């Protein structure tokens, strides 16, 4: 489960303020005051400034020469990030106040909040979080000053941090990890919390900053949970305790965020997967490996079948490839050079032995495939290809396996075994732009068919430390994707260094019903794999040419898409996807036979329908099937049977009584056949009532 970043009421997340001048020798805070800008107590209070080089500065910053700065308000993304980082410091101070033996890890701001890692003797309990939150409120009320201090040398820092082993490790850190807020600036610095009256140091932390002026500039915060976490995310390192929290520019914004968290918890696909009997993760199978139950299997089948139909209409050819392959294939593709950490260990098989146990023929390493693209390259290469065959669009629901660390495995949205709706398109350079344009339209149209309609694009470019091919090839591929993305009319956000090792990509980012952003489809342009695999086609002039390869996963994976849709619809899938589309609920046992006749008629039209013959009372049956998110509930009592009718009952408790049987069947069949994504209600379902 994740929760979206939300702008404050009335704010758009941007900072509309104009630059101001900070005279040499004057604090930024003084210039803010001189300009008449709010400094505390309002959602748009200025918390830091950005200098001409784009660096965020404390309000206590004093430039050596006149400087033009942009004020950063609390209700902007940067402003919230600074508030959250400062709140993380307050949390760390509170932890060391209440747990003096605690050692400090890292404490960065993250989307919608912050966390801090600690080495402690026992895991934190809910009571501990309450006590810590109480102590934090005391610190906020005290108005402690955040005071930046520069270490004269690393030796001075090491001496001061002698009892903080994790901070000592960070003194020499050069990883560039964005979560490491302690170092990374031009200087090695600490931030001390000072008593506002005496200016005595109360507490401090290794940190590059920036921070808000005082703890009173934290308007609203809350601790949300704790969990175990490996130091620096590496399971080979020590296991620490992580406390998560959130902080906002106003109590109103915090309250709105808490409401979103609570709604996200209600929609959590892991919770709904159990309640609706959709899927599970048996311990006997292993972490990140899902099994789909019959109801979940129906939803999955419908997702796949509709996708297959659309791909057939769009000219794709269906292929299939095995789950394991010799190591050499992934040497050729480059996966073992650039992606080995994401692959499961090899299996050595096919060895032959002599009678005395000595090896006659050594075995070979085989790998579970992490991607389908190398195998699709082999399909293309299996015979000679002509320009007349291009573009060649290959499509597969291919199951792949990726070694995700146990700490990041999360329900269906981060798994180890996943089925990708994987397409690879081979085309000429002349066809490339048109193919990308039509592909992007196809992706957006298909996602819209499933009820996801709020999109923007992200352009991921080369990681300078992790790529194959020449700079010229990467530049051409990146420019083409940027051109196609811009033509789409959607917002195109840069993602520097975010591409896979073989080519740049456009990813379709989707917002769900709660406004959360999910990366969905990816489109990657690849000039490198055709060269690595020696792919060629015969051009119109008889010469041998290399095709361009386009990688595309539309859902990302079936599992992840299933989880996202479950949360988007809060488990109430559109009727065309619902595992049970209609249920007959008799008032009494004598009405069962009639409802079974109605059900038989619906089944003849392909409707997935059941009749509840349990011993429960009708009211309890209605509650049960409402909780099971069945879109159409059909009630029948004496009057309905006599009139050859049913009464519709919907999940929002609305009802249509006395609907003639034929009209009821027609309405349900019509709703499903039109693939309506809205939840049916008495207002939306147009049907003639007999009453």
From Swiss-Prot:
<dbReference type="InterPro" id="IPR047246">
    <property type="entry name" value="ThrRS_anticodon"/>
</dbReference>
<dbReference type="GO" id="GO:0000049">
    <property type="term" value="F:tRNA binding"/>
</dbReference>
<keyword id="KW-0547">Nucleotide-binding</keyword>
<dbReference type="GO" id="GO:0006435">
    <property type="term" value="P:threonyl-tRNA aminoacylation"/>
</dbReference>
<dbReference type="GO" id="GO:0005524">
    <property type="term" value="F:ATP binding"/>
</dbReference>
<dbReference type="GO" id="GO:0046872">
    <property type="term" value="F:metal ion binding"/>
</dbReference>
<comment type="similarity">
    <text>Belongs to the class-II aminoacyl-tRNA synthetase family.</text>
</comment>
<dbReference type="GO" id="GO:0005737">
    <property type="term" value="C:cytoplasm"/>
</dbReference>
<keyword id="KW-0436">Ligase</keyword>
<dbReference type="InterPro" id="IPR004154">
    <property type="entry name" value="Anticodon-bd"/>
</dbReference>
<dbReference type="InterPro" id="IPR045864">
    <property type="entry name" value="aa-tRNA-synth_II/BPL/LPL"/>
</dbReference>
<dbReference type="InterPro" id="IPR002314">
    <property type="entry name" value="aa-tRNA-synt_IIb"/>
</dbReference>
<dbReference type="InterPro" id="IPR004095">
    <property type="entry name" value="TGS"/>
</dbReference>
<feature type="domain" description="TGS">
    <location>
        <begin position="1"/>
        <end position="73"/>
    </location>
</feature>
<protein>
    <recommendedName>
        <fullName>Threonine--tRNA ligase</fullName>
        <ecNumber>6.1.1.3</ecNumber>
    </recommendedName>
</protein>
<dbReference type="InterPro" id="IPR033728">
    <property type="entry name" value="ThrRS_core"/>
</dbReference>
<comment type="subunit">
    <text>Homodimer.</text>
</comment>
<keyword id="KW-0820">tRNA-binding</keyword>
<keyword id="KW-0862">Zinc</keyword>
<dbReference type="InterPro" id="IPR036621">
    <property type="entry name" value="Anticodon-bd_dom_sf"/>
</dbReference>
<feature type="region of interest" description="Catalytic">
    <location>
        <begin position="268"/>
        <end position="574"/>
    </location>
</feature>
<dbReference type="InterPro" id="IPR012947">
    <property type="entry name" value="tRNA_SAD"/>
</dbReference>
<keyword id="KW-0694">RNA-binding</keyword>
<comment type="function">
    <text>Catalyzes the attachment of threonine to tRNA(Thr) in a two-step reaction: L-threonine is first activated by ATP to form Thr-AMP and then transferred to the acceptor end of tRNA(Thr). Also edits incorrectly charged L-seryl-tRNA(Thr).</text>
</comment>
<keyword id="KW-0030">Aminoacyl-tRNA synthetase</keyword>
<dbReference type="InterPro" id="IPR018163">
    <property type="entry name" value="Thr/Ala-tRNA-synth_IIc_edit"/>
</dbReference>
<feature type="binding site">
    <location>
        <position position="551"/>
    </location>
    <ligand>
        <name>Zn(2+)</name>
    </ligand>
</feature>
<feature type="binding site">
    <location>
        <position position="373"/>
    </location>
    <ligand>
        <name>Zn(2+)</name>
    </ligand>
</feature>
<dbReference type="Pfam" id="PF00587">
    <property type="entry name" value="tRNA-synt_2b"/>
</dbReference>
<feature type="binding site">
    <location>
        <position position="424"/>
    </location>
    <ligand>
        <name>Zn(2+)</name>
    </ligand>
</feature>
<dbReference type="Pfam" id="PF03129">
    <property type="entry name" value="HGTP_anticodon"/>
</dbReference>
<feature type="region of interest" description="Disordered">
    <location>
        <begin position="1"/>
        <end position="22"/>
    </location>
</feature>
<dbReference type="GO" id="GO:0004829">
    <property type="term" value="F:threonine-tRNA ligase activity"/>
</dbReference>
<keyword id="KW-0067">ATP-binding</keyword>
<dbReference type="InterPro" id="IPR006195">
    <property type="entry name" value="aa-tRNA-synth_II"/>
</dbReference>
<keyword id="KW-0479">Metal-binding</keyword>
<dbReference type="InterPro" id="IPR002320">
    <property type="entry name" value="Thr-tRNA-ligase_IIa"/>
</dbReference>
<keyword id="KW-0648">Protein biosynthesis</keyword>
<dbReference type="Pfam" id="PF07973">
    <property type="entry name" value="tRNA_SAD"/>
</dbReference>
<keyword id="KW-0963">Cytoplasm</keyword>
């Amino acid at each position: 489960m994740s929760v979206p970043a939300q702008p404050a009421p009335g704010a758009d997340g941007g900072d509309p303020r104009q630059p101001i001048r900070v005279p040499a020798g004057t604090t930024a805070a003084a210039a803010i005051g001189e300009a008449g800008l709010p400094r505390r107590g309002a959602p748009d209070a200025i918390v830091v400034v950005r200098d001409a080089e784009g660096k965020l500065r404390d309000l206590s910053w004093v430039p050596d020469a006149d400087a033009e700065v942009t004020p950063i308000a609390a209700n902007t993304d940067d402003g919230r990030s600074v508030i959250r980082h400062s709140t993380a410091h307050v949390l760390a101070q509170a932890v060391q106040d209440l747990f003096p033996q605690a050692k400090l890890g890292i404490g960065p701001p993250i989307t919608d909040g912050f966390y801090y890692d600690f080495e402690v003797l026992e895991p934190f309990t809910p009571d501990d979080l309450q006590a810590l939150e109480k102590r934090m409120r005391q610190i906020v009320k005290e108005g402690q000053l955040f005071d930046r201090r520069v270490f004269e040398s690393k030796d001075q820092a090491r001496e001061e941090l002698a009892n903080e082993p994790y901070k000592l490790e960070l003194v020499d850190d050069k990883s560039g990890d964005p979560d490491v807020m302690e170092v990374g600036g031009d200087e090695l610095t600490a931030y001390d919390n000072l008593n506002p009256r005496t200016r005595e140091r109360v507490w401090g932390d290794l940190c590059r900053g920036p921070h808000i002026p005082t703890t009173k500039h934290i308007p609203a915060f809350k601790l949300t949970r704790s969990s175990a976490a490996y130091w620096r995310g590496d399971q080979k390192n020590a296991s620490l305790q992580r406390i998560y929290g959130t902080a906002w520019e106003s109590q109103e914004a915090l309250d709105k965020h808490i409401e979103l968290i609570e709604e996200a918890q209600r929609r959590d696909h892991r919770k709904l997967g159990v309640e609706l009997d959709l899927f599970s993760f048996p311990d006997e199978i292993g972490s990140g490996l899902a099994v789909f139950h019959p109801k979940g299997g129906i939803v999955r089948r419908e997702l796949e079948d509709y996708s297959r139909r659309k791909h057939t209409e769009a000219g794709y050819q269906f292929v299939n490839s095995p789950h394991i392959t010799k190591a050499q294939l992934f040497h050729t593709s480059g996966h073992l050079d650039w992606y080995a950490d994401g692959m499961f260990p090899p299996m050595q098989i096919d060895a032959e032995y002599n009678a005395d146990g000595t090896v006659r023929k050594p075995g070979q390493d085989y790998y579970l495939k992490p991607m389908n693209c190398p195998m699709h390259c082999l399909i293309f290469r299996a015979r000679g290809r002509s320009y007349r065959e291009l573009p060649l669009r290959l499509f597969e629901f291919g199951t792949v396996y990726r070694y995700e660390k146990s700490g990041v495995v999360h329900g269906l949205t981060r798994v180890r075994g996943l089925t990708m709706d994987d397409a690879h398109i081979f085309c000429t350079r002349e066809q490339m732009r048109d193919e990308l344009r039509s592909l992007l339209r196809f992706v957006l149209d298909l996602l819209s068919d499933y009820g996801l309609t709020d999109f923007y694009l992200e352009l991921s470019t080369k990681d300078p430390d992790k790529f194959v091919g020449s700079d010229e090839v990467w530049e051409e591929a990146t420019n083409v994707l940027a051109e196609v993305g811009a033509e789409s009319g959607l917002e195109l956000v840069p993602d520097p260094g975010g591409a896979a090792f073989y080519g740049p990509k456009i990813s379709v980012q989707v917002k769900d019903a709660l406004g959360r952003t999910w990366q969905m489809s990816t489109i990657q342009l690849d000039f490198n794999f055709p060269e690595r695999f020696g792919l060629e086609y015969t051009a119109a002039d008889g010469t041998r040419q290399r095709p361009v390869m386009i990688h595309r996963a539309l859902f990302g994976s079936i599992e992840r898409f299933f989880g996202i849709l479950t949360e988007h619809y809060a488990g109430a899938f559109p009727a065309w996807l619902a595992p049970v589309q209609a249920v007959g609920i008799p008032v009494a046992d004598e009405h069962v036979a009639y409802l079974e006749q109605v059900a038989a008629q619906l089944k003849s039209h392909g409707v997935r329908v059941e009749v509840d013959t349990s011993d429960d009372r009708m009211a309890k049956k209605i509650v049960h099937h409402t909780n099971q998110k069945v879109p159409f509930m059909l009630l029948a009592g004496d009057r309905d049977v006599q009139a050859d009718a049913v009464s519709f009952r919907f999940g929002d408790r609305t009802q249509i009584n006395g609907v003639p049987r034929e009209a009821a069947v027609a309405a349900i069949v019509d709703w499903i056949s039109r693939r309506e994504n809205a939840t049916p209600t008495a207002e939306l379902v147009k049907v003639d009532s007999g009453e």
